[in-house]
């Protein structure tokens, strides 16, 4: 999928197992850029070692419940989104909801339309697969991300714990409903 409305042509494609190293690199770099200034180096190092190693990303790519989309410009990976079919927290009213686990753009391109393109593709994919509700967790101190999600129609429905290294943090749980696609049944298609 090629997207207009960003500064350079942007391609969003589903990641494959061959993308594990590329996925690992963009996942860790965007996470560190986003949360490094507000967390200790020790907690950041511990979390990254637990979450972003190439073998971990390869395992996630291999799981049918995960879908990872990479955003690319001129051959460079500049962002990504990860969706996951997982049990939603109790505050999410739809038990068949799909989660946007992560959605990030490279720091030097934040505000250039990459996040917007990834969000649109994520919502489209969720709807195509029969999901009526999308939910996500966002750190309660990440005001920029919360504002972004609110612009996309997400509402705050509760909280959940997030362990970042040794630090116990609180994520806001946000959700939104999706329009039903014509001719779509009431059941969800599992990726």
Tell me the role of every PLM-derived stretch:
Residues 14-20, 24-37, 42-108, 116-121, ...:
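Acetyl-CoA-dependent GNAT
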